[in-house]
Curated annotation (Swiss-Prot):
Native source organism of the sequence: Methylococcus capsulatus (strain ATCC 33009 / NCIMB 11132 / Bath)
Gene coding for it: mraZ
GO MF terms, alphabetically ordered: DNA-binding transcription factor activity; transcription cis-regulatory region binding
GO biological process, one term: negative regulation of DNA-templated transcription initiation
PANTHER family: TRANSCRIPTIONAL REGULATOR MRAZ
Quaternary organization: Forms oligomers.
CDD domains: MraZ_C, MraZ_N
Protein name, per record: Transcriptional regulator MraZ
Cytoplasm in keyword set: yes
Pfam families to which the protein is assigned, alphabetical: MraZ
């Protein structure tokens, strides 16, 4: 499981070094084979290859005539790029994906359980602050049974 927030610098070629604490798990679970794609926010999603393949199998089974499904398939599958950890634990984020997420030098890698999000650091700080200001734990019961069942 991937968790935590990590500030990372991209190198001049657009490579990102995965923090050491995640490398062994990524090498064991997927031999360093990763998939990076666009997220529904202005961020990227980074999956171990087997996790992405499972998501992809589920997405392609959804009704193709549904516009929402088609959009999600186009975004997640259409923009997906396979990448591999090198000997130093780095991988290259393709330029079109860096451009989509406005990634420059400083990025944030956020563990999300079975995947990561990659954000521009300035945009992440701004969005996180907005979400914190909007958050109301008292309103969780109004957000559906899944969120209402959470206990803090």
């Amino acid at each position: 499981m991937f968790r935590g927030v990590n500030s990372i610098s991209l190198d001049d070629k657009g490579r990102m070094a995965v923090p050491t604490r995640y490398r062994s798990e990524l090498r064991e679970s997927c031999e360093g084979q990763l998939v990076v794609t666009v997220g529904t926010d202005t961020c990227l999603l980074l999956f171990p290859l087997p996790e992405f393949e499972e998501l992809e199998r589920k997405l392609v089974k959804l009704p193709a005539l549904n516009k929402q499904v088609k959009r999600l398939q186009r975004l997640l599958i259409g923009h997906a790029a396979e990448c591999e950890l090198d000997g130093q634990g780095r991988f290259l984020i393709p330029e079109p994906l860096r451009r989509f997420a406005s990634l420059d030098k400083q990025v944030v890698l956020i563990g999300q359980g079975n995947k990561f999000e990659i954000w521009d650091e300035v945009l992440w700080d701004r969005c996180r602050q907005e979400w914190l200001e909007e958050a109301s734990l008292e309103g969780l019961e109004d957000m559906g049974p899944e969120l209402g069942a959470l206990a803090f």
